Amino acid sequence: MSASQTSDVPTLLVKIFGKDRPGITAGLFDTLAAYSVDVVDIEQVVTRGRIVLCALVTEPPRGLEGDLRATVHSWAESLKLQAEIISGIGDNRPRGFGRSLVTVLGHPLTAEATAAIAARITESGSNIDRIFRLAKYPVTAVEFAVSGVETEPLRTALATEAAALGVDIAVVAAGLHRRAQRLVVMDVDSTLIQDEVIELFAAHAGCEDEVAEVTAAAMRGELDFEQSLHARVALLAGLDASVVDKVRAEVRLTPGARTLIRTLKRLGYQVGVVSGGFTQVTDALQEQLGLDFAQANTLEIVDGRLTGRVTGEIVDRAGKARLLRRFAAAAGVPLSQTVAIGDGANDLDMLNAAGLGVAFNAKPVVREAAHTAVNVPFLDTVLYLLGITREEVEAADTLADDLGDGPGRP
């Protein structure tokens, strides 16, 4: 074991800050190299053109520390930078148990909200080890790496702050399992798309109000989903089957849906949808978006008209969870490596069964029960909960465009 790997070795923390320019990092370590020091740790960040570079190194041989300090300060001054050198022992203290990642989404993210979140993390007994910006638009997304408290109580402590401050806060356990998630399954109506498909059909049948009333009650969990499904579909009896193509054309993807799916597919994820809506729409979405899995209810059509009935397996609350398990088995992925996204009460079993359940612009009962919630109108913000940065997404799009295989961004 080298001296730099022991906890009691004398070290120097060298901090450089000022206007960023090429060559600062190389210049600092070239200066330090003359004193035979070992590098213990390095951190560097550039914010609005200003650099903060911290290097933790072992002390130089006896009698040379004063010369090292003078040389570093002289080098920094020559570049109009500031330098600070602090003596100490060893490296950072070991991170505490209960390592978690706290992702905060704000539109905007205010100083007041940031202060309240940091204070609640501290009050819970956690320590903030690192802060990193994941995205600056369409929302500001910031990730806090914290330690000292188990994930579940920290999530509970921050849930109240999220509601009061008007931000979204996701808390997940840190570790390799986060990088291992390989299957994402989402609801369709009001999640993948902005619409409720049954209401699009109802508009053509002239029964929007009746269908909307039943839909709202079902999504709040006040009605049995299967009963409400049959009641709503019955109102469509006699509708000409040509309406199916019209409804497909009316469907509007949620902003960020293409970006989410495109990015996940590039990373090797499999992506599926489950819907209490209809295969007449989800099959088209599967082909359009390149989805690996899709399952929904099927409207019965006889002699060119809707009969007012559905056929086959009913996709309800329990059915969505069952399909998540089925898709995971087909993909060879354990449930712990799945992500589920939904907005309604009939998504709850699926959200709870997944390794990470995300309530997307959901009803209060769903937000409270899910692992985490997102309340901004951009579906690709789910990527930030997986630790994927906006910069990485855009770089991948640019590379695809340069190679001539860009998918056509929304």
Swiss-Prot record:
InterPro entries reported in the protein's UniProt record: ACT-like_dom_sf, ACT_dom, HAD-like_SerB, HAD-like_sf, HAD_sf, PSP, PSP_ACT
Residues annotated as binding substrate: E196, R232, S275, G276, K320, N346
Domain of life, source organism: Bacteria
Positions contributing to Mg(2+) binding: D187, D189, D343
Alphabetized UniProt keyword annotations: Amino-acid biosynthesis, Hydrolase, Magnesium, Metal-binding, Serine biosynthesis
GO CC list: cytoplasm
UniProt key word NAD: no
Reactions listed under catalytic activity: O-phospho-L-serine + H2O = L-serine + phosphate; O-phospho-D-serine + H2O = D-serine + phosphate
Pathway entry: Amino-acid biosynthesis; L-serine biosynthesis; L-serine from 3-phospho-D-glycerate: step 3/3
Cofactor: Mg(2+)
Domain (ACT): residue spans on this chain: 13-91
EC number: 3.1.3.3
GO biological process: L-serine biosynthetic process
Family the entry assigns: Belongs to the HAD-like hydrolase superfamily. SerB family.
Protein name: Phosphoserine phosphatase
